[in-house]
Each structure stands twice: as structure tokens, then as C-alpha cells.
Regions:
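A structural signal for short secondary-structure junctions
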Residues: 17, 84-87, 105-109, 144-145
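Structural helix-adjacent loops and short alpha-helical linkers that scaffold large soluble proteins
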Residues: 27-41, 95-110, 155-168
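C-terminal substrate/ligand-recognition segments
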Residues: 68-102, 151-155
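Short amphipathic alpha-helical interaction segments
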Residues: 79-83, 101, 105, 117, ...
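Extracellular low-complexity, Gly/Ser/Thr-rich intrinsically disordered linkers
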Residues: 90, 102, 106-116, 148-149
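Ser/Thr/Asn(+Pro)-rich, low-complexity disordered segments
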Residues: 98-100, 109, 131-134, 140-141, ...
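Acidic, low-complexity intrinsically disordered tails
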Residues: 169-176
């Protein structure tokens, strides 16, 4: 899906970004259901990492694999590849709409956060990560929206149970 239509100078932006997942994940999706599967597949193949979704796919113009350097360099990378942990929530929502009987795969998408609970800020999840391995945590080391979306997704993948033993359940997730 285009990220921007009728943008600057009338140009459409066809860069692969995570915004397209919202067209499916919303309570009332705005994308025709016949298009859900291809969007999910593209996001899974090009944007999904063990710690969230990249803000821009590798190979796209201006892609930045690392969020480092001086302030100007970090600002340039912020939305050009940097992984946002909180985006795992909308991805899991969309995945479960397309694959309602595949909670196991949805749970596996959360497996990369297991190690994050023991690094950066123990018991929490960082705001952002580098876009390439080893997915170094960056930004705020204890980001509320990152934690909230991982926990919300964990509850969804466990069939909606309200009580979740966070550390134990995340630790039980196997990652391929």
C-alpha cells in the first residue's frame, strides 16, 4: 500500500512502511478483506523483526540500519528503518484477523521481547531498536507504549485471559 497518496509535488510514496498494517488492525478495517493477506505477508517479510516493526524496509531509499551518531544522525534514522517495539501490537491484531486460528504464530512474534526483559532496563522494553541484528535497544529504556502493546498482544495470543504471568509467559515462548 502507498504510505502517502498525492504527496509533495503530487507524488505517491510507495516506500514499504508499517502504517499499512493499521488499514487491517483497526476495529473497523479500512482495507478490502481480499487485500489483507498480501499486506500481512509484505509486512512480515520486510518489516517484522524479533523486537517490533521497522519504520522503513531495508533496500528503500534513505533506509538507516542503525540509530546512532550525533543528534542529527539519530533524527535522520528515527523513521527511516528504526524498529518500533509498540508496532508489534497492531501487527498481532492484523495477523489474528487474517489467521484467527493461528495464535501460536502470533505468540512467537513476541518471543524476541523475552531477552529485552533482562537487558537495557530490567523488567521493561525499550522504545526503539536498531533495524538490523543484534537489534540494539535505543531511545527510552522503559517505554510505556512498548510494554503496553507487548502485554496486550500477549493476552490476545493467550486467548484473551486477563491474568498473565508476564515474565514466565514471555519466557515460555519459543522462537524459531
Amino acid at each position: 500500500l502507498y504510505d502517502v497518496v498525492d504527496g509533495e509535488n503530487g507524488r505517491d510514496d510507495c516506500a514499504c512502511r508499517p502504517n499499512q498494517i493499521f488499514a487491517i488492525s483497526l476495529d473497523h478495517p479500512i482495507l478490502d478483506q481480499a487485500r489483507w493477506q498480501p499486506v500481512i505477508q509484505i509486512v512480515k517479510d520486510r518489516l517484522l523483526t524479533p523486537v517490533g516493526l521497522r519504520s522503513l524496509a531495508p533496500g528503500e531509499h534513505d533506509y538507516k540500519p542503525r540509530y546512532d551518531g550525533d543528534l542529527r544522525a539519530r533524527d535522520a534514522a528515527y523513521h527511516q528503518g528504526t524498529v518500533w517495539a509498540w508496532l508489534i501490537g497492531p501487527f498481532v491484531d492484523a495477523w489474528l484477523k487474517v489467521h484467527p486460528d493461528d495464535r501460536a504464530s502470533a505468540a512467537e512474534f513476541l518471543g524476541g521481547f523475552r531477552s529485552q526483559l533482562r537487558t537495557a532496563c530490567v523488567g521493561s522494553i525499550s522504545e526503539i531498536f536498531d533495524a538490523e541484528p543484534p537489534y540494539t535497544p535505543r531511545g527510552c529504556c522503559a517505554q510505556a507504549w512498548s510494554v503496553a502493546e507487548v502485554l496486550r498482544s500477549l493476552v490476545k495470543t493467550r486467548g484473551g485471559r486477563e491474568k498473565v504471568e508476564t515474565t514466565n509467559e514471555l519466557s515460555s515462548v519459543t522462537v524459531a
